[in-house]
């Protein structure tokens, strides 16, 4: 029962963040981290010409994740585990198309057309179709937080290194407190595409590394390779989880003290009992999910009714940089999840209060 509750239910969300969406997320982070870098440059005596050069580099990295066509093999390692996937991204005007196929463990194919994501599990013949508006908006939400980045992170350029056969500029992002992790990022010099991203612990150790082992940039756009499998679902049991916008106050909750720098960016209700109800199925019990972001990373708070059969004991578990804190709070079961230190999760959990019975 340890990781079989909300962790399992939202596994596909984590996979997407770790793979295809990781490119856009990290690239967006580079773009919004610029104010901190500008301050660091001024303090170290770097001139305005160099600051402008870094600004252009960061913005190009952000644009590359959204507007470049590329395909390659993406590898994620951390916590003694490693996984890989074949990833392709195509852009035609305002439309974006992505596909990700796992190369390890159980076969899993993920296809995205803008904010519609279809996940196929060939072995079990299950298809999950989701309107992942939250995921699609994450880069924009993070960019909106650029006024806070300099307060909580320092950003520095750190030379050039080679990744997957490409010369890449290196950026180091250091936290100013103990409530968040640091990052080291690599971007292709020619295109700006993010090539590698490391999550760094408090002692500068690598908690997780996500990188291309091979990638071809500028490939021909092939949206049909994404759209066709999204439509061909014969023989699959199709599940369509739905997200319903809400507010913590509406659900009878309040967060009195989020970690410094984190702001609420979304609050929804989503179905329990697996990833959702099958087409035409009855409505299921729901969990409340509130997402908080500091501009570079996020924390999710899940609240569901306590169930003694499923919620056997409190726990704190780690998978790479992702920590999960689960505990009972009265008649409720609270799960706090994020790529942040344990102190951050505990602060969120302590600040959560029930405002109505």
Question: Would you name each region that the model predicts?
Answer:
Residues 2, 39-125, 151-200:
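N-terminal mature ectodomain segment of secretory-pathway/periplasmic proteins
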Residues 121-141:
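Acidic/charged, solvent-exposed loop-and-adjacent secondary-structure segments enriched in E/D, K/R, S/T
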Residues 234-330, 342-347:
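Short, solvent-exposed recognition patches
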């Amino acid at each position: 029962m340890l990781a079989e509750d909300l962790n399992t239910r939202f596994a596909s969300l984590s996979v997407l963040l770790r793979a295809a969406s990781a490119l856009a997320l990290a690239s967006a982070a580079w773009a919004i981290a610029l104010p901190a870098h500008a301050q660091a440059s001024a303090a170290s005596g770097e001139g305005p010409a160099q600051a402008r050069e870094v600004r252009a580099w960061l913005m190009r990295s952000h644009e590359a994740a959204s507007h470049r066509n590329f395909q390659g093999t993406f590898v994620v390692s951390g916590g003694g585990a490693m996984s890989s996937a074949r990833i392709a991204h195509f852009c035609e005007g305002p439309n974006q198309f992505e596909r990700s196929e796992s190369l390890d463990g159980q076969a899993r194919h993920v296809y995205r057309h803008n904010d519609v994501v279809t996940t196929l599990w060939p072995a079990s013949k299950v298809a999950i179709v989701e309107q992942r508006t939250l995921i699609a908006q994450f880069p924009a939400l993070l960019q909106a937080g650029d006024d806070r980045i300099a307060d909580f992170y320092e950003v520095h350029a750190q030379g050039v290194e080679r990744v997957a056969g490409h010369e890449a500029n290196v950026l180091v992002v250091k936290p100013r407190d103990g409530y968040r992790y640091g990052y080291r990022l690599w971007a292709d010099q020619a295109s700006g595409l993010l090539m590698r991203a490391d999550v760094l612990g408090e002692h500068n150790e690598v908690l997780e590394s996500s990188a291309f082992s091979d990638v071809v940039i500028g490939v021909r756009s092939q949206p049909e390779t994404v759209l066709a499998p999204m439509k061909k679902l014969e023989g699959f049991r199709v599940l369509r989880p739905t997200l319903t916008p809400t507010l913590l106050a509406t659900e009878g909750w309040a967060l009195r003290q989020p970690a410094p720098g984190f702001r609420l960016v979304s609050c929804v209700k989503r179905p329990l009992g697996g990833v959702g109800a099958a087409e035409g199925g009855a409505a299921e019990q729901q969990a409340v999910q509130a997402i908080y972001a500091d501009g570079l990373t996020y924390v999710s708070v899940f609240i569901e009714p306590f169930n003694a059969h499923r919620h056997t004991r409190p726990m704190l578990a780690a998978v790479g940089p992702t920590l999960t804190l689960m505990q009972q709070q009265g008649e409720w079961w609270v799960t706090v999840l994020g790529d942040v230190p344990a102190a951050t999760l505990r602060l969120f959990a302590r600040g959560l209060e029930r405002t109505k019975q």
